[in-house]
């Protein structure tokens, strides 16, 4: 395999409002390992995202599954961590909101069975506590990335 095939997808910096408004997703192939993408309203094809914000809530969905809400200046990212994300699940179990966190994760959309609404979430690859300066720098870089996408 070539290096390109083994490299990770870029983790895009985007605000929650853009991600929350995404309603289209697709798979790049029929193989179960084919990358899945969320298409944002700006037309960006996102497999992975990077966000920094305030972890405002952590909930136990089941014994093995935690849901975290990460707020940025425009909205909220939702992340779920369970048995396949043990480090992130442990982080969420021990976290004491509110606190600033950085999240790198896989972008996903899903549609509840009883709804026509398309919801978004990020499956965490990395979840880390950060300081205010890191959050502020991320907000500036996310704004610059957004301007590049719409410019």
Show where each model-derived region lies:
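Short, conserved beta-turn/loop elements at beta-strand boundaries and strand-helix junctions
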Residues: 58-63, 112, 132
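OB-fold and OB-like beta-barrel modules that bind single-stranded nucleic acids
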Residues: 47-57, 96-109, 122-127
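A general secondary-structure signal for short beta-strands and their flanking turns/coil
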Residues: 46-48, 63-65, 100, 117
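OB-fold (S1/OB) nucleic-acid-binding surfaces
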Residues: 60-85
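Short, conserved secondary-structure segments in the cores of folded domains
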Residues: 42-45, 91
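OB/S1-fold single-stranded nucleic-acid-binding modules
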Residues: 1-43
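Extended, charge-rich, solvent-exposed interface segments
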Residues: 90-100, 113-151
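Intrinsically disordered, low-complexity coil segments
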Residues: 26-34, 110-119
């Amino acid at each position: 395999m070539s290096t390109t095939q083994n490299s990770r997808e870029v983790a895009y910096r985007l605000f929650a409002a853009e991600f929350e408004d995404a309603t289209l997703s697709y798979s790049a192939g029929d193989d179960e390992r084919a990358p899945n993408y969320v298409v944002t309203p700006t037309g960006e094809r996102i497999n992975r995202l990077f966000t920094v914000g305030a972890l405002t809530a952590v909930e136990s969905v089941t014994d093995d599954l935690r849901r975290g809400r990460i707020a940025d200046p425009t909205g909220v990212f939702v992340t779920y961590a369970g048995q396949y994300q043990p480090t992130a699940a442990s982080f969420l179990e021990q976290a004491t909101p509110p606190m600033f966190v950085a999240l790198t994760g896989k972008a996903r959309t899903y549609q509840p069975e009883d709804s026509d609404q398309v919801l978004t979430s990020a499956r965490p690859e990395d979840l880390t506590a950060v300081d205010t300066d890191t959050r502020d720098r991320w907000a500036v870089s996310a704004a610059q990335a957004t301007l590049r996408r719409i410019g």
